[in-house]
A protein has these predicted regions:
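Short active-site neighborhood of thiol/selenol oxidoreductases, capturing the structured segment around
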Residues: 9-12
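Local cysteine-cluster metal-coordination motifs and their immediate loop/turn environment
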Residues: 14-27
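C-terminal scaffold of the Radical SAM
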Residues: 4-6, 27-56, 61-300
């Protein structure tokens, strides 16, 4: 009998306030009101179609983890997220200690919703801080400032979350070694259980690709990584993926499932999935990228 790997679920919410110049994810700048209730209904219909189509792979399995990414999922209300999670659980069982991560902006409006997301069932928030330098944040097209980022972390700590992550970038336009390390020191000072510390890369078809900024050279990048890695290690963080650092016991289970070649369902615009079948065959699939098509019920 085929032994199945753990099963996860990725949920994609594609809207954001504005497209960042480095972003190559499937995200769409918000224009008017986001149809969040309608989109949630389509997410559930998408899941139902997959559960029926891939029954041979999915039946008798429970969800090990879930990741709600974007875009900016925290543009959705806590009520919508609660409905989404409840409807998913009605259709596929959750494991006893399921990890449910949701990406969020550290802007004031989104951060105030953290407690509501926890009440909805979210166990882990991943915040896109990127930098604590206001000039660098502006250059990256981020809509929050350093003060809002720090405030959001304080709110996360008292929201009832089991864990939270801070996304931080280095190798930013015109960034010096000391600026990069200062960002990292400020992040460490806030004592998140998990830090994702990754280098800015220029991806095709982004604004930065069309108008490339001046970035640190390879020698400077190596110095940033070497000294930054030492800071993180000395602060008790363990590197367990290329850009992921965690305090012991706080590794992201969803990302580990990707790294360990686990299975994952995928719903939402542009979401990618991978499933193992009883005969050992492996299927990879992706969903319709644009919200217009997806909201017409064209999921594949």
């Amino acid at each position: 009998m085929q032994k199945f790997p753990p099963l996860s679920l990725y949920v994609h919410i594609p809207w954001c306030v504005q497209k960042c110049p480095y972003c190559d994810f499937n995200s769409h700048a918000q224009k008017g009101t986001i149809p969040e209730q309608e989109y949630v209904q389509h997410l559930i219909a998408d899941l139902e179609a997959d559960l029926e189509k891939y029954q041979a792979s999915i039946q008798h399995r429970s969800l090990h983890s879930m990741f709600i990414g974007g875009g900016t999922p925290s543009l959705f209300s806590a009520e919508s997220i609660k409905l989404l999670l409840a409807e998913i659980q009605r259709r596929i069982p959750f494991s006893e200690n399921i990890e449910i991560t949701m990406e969020a902006n550290p802007g004031t409006v989104e951060a105030e919703r953290f407690k509501g997301y926890v009440d909805a069932g979210v166990t882990r928030i991943s915040m896109g801080i990127q930098s604590f330098n206001d000039d660098k944040l502006q250059r990256l097209g981020r809509i929050h400032n350093a003060e809002e980022a720090t405030s959001a972390v304080s709110l996360a700590k008292v929201s009832g979350l089991k864990s939270f992550n801070l996304d931080l970038m280095h190798g930013l336009p015109n960034q010096t070694l000391e600026e990069a390390l200062d960002d990292l020191r400020q992040a460490i000072e806030l004592a998140p259980p998990h830090l994702s510390w990754y280098q800015l890369t220029i991806e095709p078809n982004t604004m930065f690709a069309y108008r490339p900024p001046t970035l640190p050279d390879d020698d400077e990048l190596w110095d940033i990584f070497e000294q930054g890695h030492q800071l993180l290690t000395e602060a008790g963080y363990q590197q367990y993926e290329t850009s992921a650092y965690a305090k012991p016991g706080f590794q992201c289970q969803h990302n580990l499932n990707y790294w360990r070649f686990g299975d994952y369902l995928a719903i939402g615009c542009g979401a990618h999935g991978k499933l193992t079948f009883p005969d050992g065959d492996i299927l990879r699939f992706s969903k319709t990228k644009h919200p217009k098509g997806y909201l017409r019920g064209e999921y594949l």
